[in-house]
């Protein structure tokens, strides 16, 4: 009994002391050059591992990459940035085996023509929607490896628009049936009709997966105005038979030739890289043999917004730019030439910076047992993907590498 009382007094004294003088983490503080060297080696191993390569490709590809391939790379990079922003806003985090390995990026441009049996002539007067068709049959053999699919369309300003904003809704077109609807609602949002051009992105993973498994279900997508068969007065009263016109214009759709709802119109430029398209992220089967699903919640940590603006001495994310040709000695990666990989550094004071009660108890335990396990260290918490462009022989590859950019840190 006396022994337990003595231990309790020791713990209480340690708690009192910690509130006045914070003990620092025992993790060794490294100089920048040593950190950069270790980080470079880690990145080298990460990239090869995520691509399932044992060594860098010998072929470096052509000296000049075609514009179409660069456009796909840029479009993918922009899409991933949007996805990371959405993930941050929803406070969600995915940490699965499928997240780890690199994804092959495939782009499918909109094609002309309407599918059979999907005449959606509910509102014959005025243009109330646009239909978008895609041929994704080349990806059917890898249908089970679809990781994500995004529908992207470029909104362009409409100077003659009568309203500054309009609500649009995205639908999957279904085969007509007396007992089911002709459309399946996917998403909706308010969009500006004027202003600078902007890309609109919609998650259509489930829809595209259905198309890949059942080709006959691929009847296209439709963007329609909300409540297309009537419009509204300023006070909210409904005006029947006064059809609201879709005033939002999209790049690649010749609106002047649209005369009826569901009329696709014609493509202004068939090869225009800004036309509506799908981006499919596919996980090659040889990179994932036994996929698992999972997820967890996360909380905000010491991120770049805070650490890059403040002279924080404790645990924080630090900027570190890696030049792939110079630091890695690689010429086979065409884009990017370099990127901010960043790293975590700084001491972890007990009781204040630790992110869990477990870390506090661990600190006290280590004080009583100095030869036991190490104290909390400054480690990455949030990481973002990196898009790369490289060649395998003469074939260009645009792929997404997960967890390559450190965005925030924590003590753990």
UniProtKB/Swiss-Prot annotation:
**Keywords attached to this entry:** Cleavage on pair of basic residues, Disulfide bond, Extracellular matrix, Glycoprotein, Growth factor, Mitogen, Secreted, Signal
Signal peptide range equals: 1-23
Family indicated by similarity: Belongs to the TGF-beta family.
Glycan-modified residues:
74, 135, 142
What does the annotation say about its assembly with partners?
Latency-associated peptide: Homodimer; disulfide-linked. Latency-associated peptide: Interacts with Transforming growth factor beta-3 (TGF-beta-3) chain; interaction is non-covalent and maintains (TGF-beta-3) in a latent state. Latency-associated peptide: Interacts (via cell attachment site) with integrins, leading to release of the active TGF-beta-3. Transforming growth factor beta-3: Homodimer; disulfide-linked. Transforming growth factor beta-3: Interacts with TGF-beta receptors (TGFBR1 and TGFBR2), leading to signal transduction.
Q: Which GO terms describe its cellular component?
A: extracellular matrix; extracellular space
Which PROSITE patterns does the UniProt record give?
A: TGF_BETA_1 (PS00250), TGF_BETA_2 (PS51362)
Got any disulfides in this one, which pairs?
A: 307-316, 315-378, 344-409, 348-411
Q: Which InterPro entries does this one have?
A: Cystine-knot_cytokine, TGF-b_C, TGF-b_propeptide, TGF-beta, TGF-beta-rel, TGFB3, TGFb_CS
Give GO BP annotations, semicolon-separated: cardiac epithelial to mesenchymal transition; cell activation; cell-cell junction organization; detection of hypoxia; embryonic digestive tract development; epithelial to mesenchymal transition involved in endocardial cushion formation; face morphogenesis; mesenchyme migration
Q: What PTM annotation applies here? A: Transforming growth factor beta-3 proprotein: The precursor proprotein is cleaved in the Golgi apparatus to form Transforming growth factor beta-3 (TGF-beta-3) and Latency-associated peptide (LAP) chains, which remain non-covalently linked, rendering TGF-beta-3 inactive.
Q: Function, please?
A: Transforming growth factor beta-3 proprotein: Precursor of the Latency-associated peptide (LAP) and Transforming growth factor beta-3 (TGF-beta-3) chains, which constitute the regulatory and active subunit of TGF-beta-3, respectively. Transforming growth factor beta-3: Multifunctional protein that regulates embryogenesis and cell differentiation and is required in various processes such as secondary palate development. Activation into mature form follows different steps: following cleavage of the proprotein in the Golgi apparatus, Latency-associated peptide (LAP) and Transforming growth factor beta-3 (TGF-beta-3) chains remain non-covalently linked rendering TGF-beta-3 inactive during storage in extracellular matrix.
One family name in Pfam for this protein: TGF_beta
State the taxonomy lineage: Eukaryota, Metazoa, Chordata, Craniata, Vertebrata
What one GO molecular function would you report for this record? cytokine activity
User: What is this protein identified as?
Assistant: Transforming growth factor beta-3 proprotein
Query: What is the species listed in this Swiss-Prot or TrEMBL entry?
Result: Gallus gallus
Q: Motif (Cell attachment site) spans which residues?
A: 261-263
């Amino acid at each position: 009994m006396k022994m337990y009382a003595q231990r309790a007094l020791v713990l209480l004294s340690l708690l009192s002391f910690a509130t006045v003088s914070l003990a620092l983490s025992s993790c060794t503080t490294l100089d920048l050059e040593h950190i950069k060297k270790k980080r470079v080696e880690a990145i080298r191993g990460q990239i090869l591992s995520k691509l399932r390569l044992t060594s860098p490709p010998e072929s470096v590809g052509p000296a000049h990459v075609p514009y179409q391939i660069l456009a796909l790379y840029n479009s993918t990079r922009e899409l991933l940035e949007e996805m990371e922003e959405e993930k941050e806003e929803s406070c969600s985090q995915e940490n699965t085996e499928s997240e780890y390995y690199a994804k092959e990026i495939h782009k499918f441009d909109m094609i002309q023509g309407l599918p059979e049996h999907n005449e959606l002539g509910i509102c014959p007067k005025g243009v109330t929607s646009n239909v978008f068709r895609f041929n994704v049959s080349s990806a059917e053999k890898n249908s089970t490896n679809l990781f994500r699919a995004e529908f992207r369309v470029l909104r362009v300003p409409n100077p003659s628009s009568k309203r500054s904003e309009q609500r649009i809704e995205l639908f999957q077109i279904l085969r007509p049936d007396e007992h089911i609807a002709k459309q399946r609602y996917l998403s909706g949002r308010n969009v500006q009709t004027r202003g600078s051009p902007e890309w609109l992105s919609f998650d259509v993973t489930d829809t595209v997966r259905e198309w890949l498994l059942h080709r006959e279900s691929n009847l296209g997508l439709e963007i329609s105005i909300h409540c297309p068969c009537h419009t509204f007065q300023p006070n909210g009263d409904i005006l029947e038979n006064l059809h609201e016109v879709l005033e939002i214009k999209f790049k690649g759709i010749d609106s002047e030739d649209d005369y009826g709802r569901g009329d696709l119109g014609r493509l202004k430029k068939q090869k225009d890289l800004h036309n509506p398209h799908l981006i499919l992220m596919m996980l090659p089967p040889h990179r994932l043999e036994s996929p698992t699903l999972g997820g967890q919640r996360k909380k905000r940590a010491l991120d770049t917004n805070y650490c890059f603006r403040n002279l924080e001495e404790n645990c924080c994310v630090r900027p570190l730019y890696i030049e792939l040709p110079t630091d890695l000695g690689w010429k086979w990666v065409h884009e990017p030439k370099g990127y901010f990989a960043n790293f975590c550094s700084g001491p972890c004071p007990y009781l204040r910076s630790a992110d869990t009660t477990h870390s506090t108890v661990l600190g006290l335990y280590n004080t009583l047992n100095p030869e036991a396990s190490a104290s909390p260290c400054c480690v990455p918490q949030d990481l973002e993907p990196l898009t790369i462009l490289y060649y395998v022989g003469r074939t260009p590859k645009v792929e997404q590498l997960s967890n390559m950019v450190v965005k925030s840190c924590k003590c753990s």
